[in-house]
Amino acid sequence: MDFGHVLTAMVTPFDAKGNVDLEKVERLVEFLLANGTEGLVVAGTTGESPTLREEEKLALFEKVVTVVNKRVPVIAGTGSNNTYVSAQLTKKATALGVDGIMAVTPYYNKPSQEGMYAHFAAIAEATHLPVMLYNIPSRSVVNLSAETIVKLSYIPNITSLKEANGDLDHMVSVIEQTPDTFHLYSGDDSLTLPALSIGAKGVVSVASHIIGPEMQQMMMAFRGGDVEHAANLHRKLLPIMKGLFTAPNPTCVKAALQIKGFDTGGVRLPLVPPTSEQRQHLQFLIEQLKVS
């Protein structure tokens, strides 16, 4: 399956009591699709997966699948640092009708490369769906090596990688050595254009909550051969891309959505709301986008 070029790692909306708000989920899905999203990643890092209970994740998967109704791929974040739990959640997500699976590198346990290979292989074995690997060493401590990614890419239903280690040399090595059917996605909004320039398929984006149409414009300009226009857009969008990460994700993107008039609630502990200074900075960045 082709997941598309601009995928959104969707926030999880909460109500005033901190419960998952499925009505807001529906509205958010429609908002994102109307603003250029070609695929939705549900219950990933941006969706606060570590603080969601399994029943909440399953309710999210089911709701998003129903609302999307096959318009774009729905990718379920089923990864954790417990291989058995991840595989079982993958089976349940598959039964709910999602289109793909995303699994993060196991955090805290600090597994070896061999351990990570076995972890992802077990998750892939639990489903017939395409699986996206997710490498984010800043959060998980371990870094999935290019060699291990290449080895995993030959498992038939491991078809893509969300790469968030920020290392373009590493990305080149992965793209060079994996099959043409295996796609690399930037896991950092600010590296979208550099990653595209070395052969990445697209981006799994947080900023697309706020600048979805502009992200699509940049993607289309690059793919259409207008690299100069794509570069101009990249430079224009870079401040908001960076600004959304001045506090632990998804703190700032939820605040930015609220500033723009779409309240998706707060974040769950141990995350805390942004400071007044952070909110003011986000307000400034959003206002700058309007006038630029």
UniProtKB/Swiss-Prot annotation:
Pathway participation: Amino-acid biosynthesis; L-lysine biosynthesis via DAP pathway; (S)-tetrahydrodipicolinate from L-aspartate: step 3/4
Pfam families per record: DHDPS
Keywords: Amino-acid biosynthesis, Cytoplasm, Diaminopimelate biosynthesis, Lyase, Lysine biosynthesis, Schiff base
Reactions that this protein is recorded to catalyse: L-aspartate 4-semialdehyde + pyruvate = (2S,4S)-4-hydroxy-2,3,4,5-tetrahydrodipicolinate + H2O + H(+)
BP term (GO), one: lysine biosynthetic process via diaminopimelate
Site features described as Part of a proton relay during catalysis, chain residue numbers: T45, Y108
Subcellular location(s) per record: Cytoplasm
InterPro entries in the record: Aldolase_TIM, DapA, DapA-like, Schiff_base-form_aldolases_AS, Schiff_base-form_aldolases_CS
One example GO MF annotation: 4-hydroxy-tetrahydrodipicolinate synthase activity
GO cellular component terms listed in the entry, alphabetical order: cytosol
Broadest EC class assigned to this enzyme: lyase
Catalytic site: Y134, K162
Tree of life domain: Bacteria
EC number from the UniProt entry: 4.3.3.7
Primary location group: cytoplasm
Family according to the record: Belongs to the DapA family.
Assembly mode: Homotetramer; dimer of dimers.
HAMAP family: DapA
General function of this protein: Catalyzes the condensation of (S)-aspartate-beta-semialdehyde [(S)-ASA] and pyruvate to 4-hydroxy-tetrahydrodipicolinate (HTPA).
Protein name: 4-hydroxy-tetrahydrodipicolinate synthase 2
